[in-house]
Amino acid sequence: MNFLVVIVTTVSLAGAASAGEIQNLYQFGKMVMCLGNLNVLEGLEYNGYGCYCGRGGKGTPLDDTDRCCKQHDECYERATDEMGCWSIETYATTYDYTKSKVSGKCTIKCKLESDYSRFTIRKKCKAFICECDRIGAQCFADKRSTFNRSLISYTKDKC
């Protein structure tokens, strides 16, 4: 069953993303599913949700879930503006993290910059982008009660 989940997720993302982007989106998706205790189909519903979830983002967020996506986008902007990460890195870099479940509750811990090997390239960006994704996924979990099914695949032209 896990193999099927990986295939479905990868194929769903492949139409709109490069190979690096797929890996990064896959990592973010795994965080979203773990922290939110969601299955793969529920996790995929965030892509294209509201005005900010998925590719692009504009206008005013429509609810707290959409605000999580706006904050995630802003974190990626800080990665380029303040951390010196390349724009492509925010979507294409892969990073290291650990996840654990205690009493059915998932926790995610991103590898710190100092914990990467000295031979690792762009470790500051890897650590920062992982934190962006972890915080975004935690926001989705915290705001899951605001998730509005009518905002799935929302037309961005309305934003």
Swiss-Prot record:
Residues the entry annotates as binding Ca(2+): 52, 54, 56, 73
Subcellular location: Secreted
GO cellular component, one term: extracellular region
InterPro entries: PLipase_A2, PLipase_A2_dom, PLipase_A2_dom_sf, PLipase_A2_His_AS
Disulfide-bonded cysteines: 51-159, 53-69, 68-139, 75-132, 85-125, 110-130
Main localization (coarse): secreted
Active site (UniProt): 72, 133
Protein name: Phospholipase A2 AP-PLA2-I
Source organism of this protein record: Acanthaster planci (Crown-of-thorns starfish)
